[in-house]
UniProtKB/Swiss-Prot annotation:
It comes from Arabidopsis thaliana. Binds 2 iron ions per subunit. This is Inositol oxygenase 4. Its cofactor is Fe cation. Transmembrane segments: none annotated.
Amino acid sequence: MTISVEKPIFEEVSAFEKSGDNIGELKLDGGFSMPKMDTNDDEAFLAPEMNAFGRQFRDYDVESERQKGVEEFYRLQHINQTVDFVKKMRAEYGKLDKMVMSIWECCELLNEVVDESDPDLDEPQIQHLLQSAEAIRKDYPNEDWLHLTALIHDLGKVITLPQFGGLPQWAVVGDTFPVGCAFDESNVHHKYFVENPDFHNETYNTKNGIYSEGCGLNNVMMSWGHDDYMYLVAKENGSTLPSAGQFIIRYHSFYPLHTAGEYTHLMNEEDKENLKWLHVFNKYDLYSKSKVHVDVEKVKPYYMSLIKKYFPENLRW
């Protein structure tokens, strides 16, 4: 079955930034435009200036005990995410032989996961999923595929649990980046890539590396983690989510692309169209993190109906 997505109405803007007058206004990189929301401006989701710890979002330089752990996480990630490692993980987890369960069962399982790479929140993951989904649902009530995408975008983090192989957090969470080409300096804590074997490999350390310009992100190997795993689960289990939804799942942690604007030379035209939706999604993914809990039982029936619409009852994981 093919699902068509109504293209958003676009307004011309020139940069991805917060407006000084309205912190909820989202502006997009490279002249991309913002889809008009279905709610009035006064009712729309406002991006807060501070995270749950009272600090700026994605501030990796402020000194704190949590930040020390985040930096150590990125040191390990940057050293160990190599082409060979990614190939090994893709082969292992591509078997989808870890478990059979429903999407909602996986949501509940995610309660056991706390993301050590996240400087903004230390809450159970299901709350972040519901916070993102409910914020999008309010502003874009007619885009049900986007609501569901928000709900499931982080489900791949279950691969850090013992029943899924118990991967270390550096192989599950954090910002993602291409392997097989040069590590762009926009990557958080870039200095640690010097200890990555691929950094010194002449086949991999040029701008294009093993890829060609405009080859399309689908042909690019990303650092292994929950993004690629959940994309694989959705694709191989026959999800009918539209291309934009699957793109969001696969690249929502690719901050060097969707926030810094790097690696665009690897994109094709379809990637560029889908990136517009990812820019929309990122506002809610990043800024909806808070200590205010969503009533799970109250919203569960709605999301169960979306799961039934876009996914089989049980999936191979």
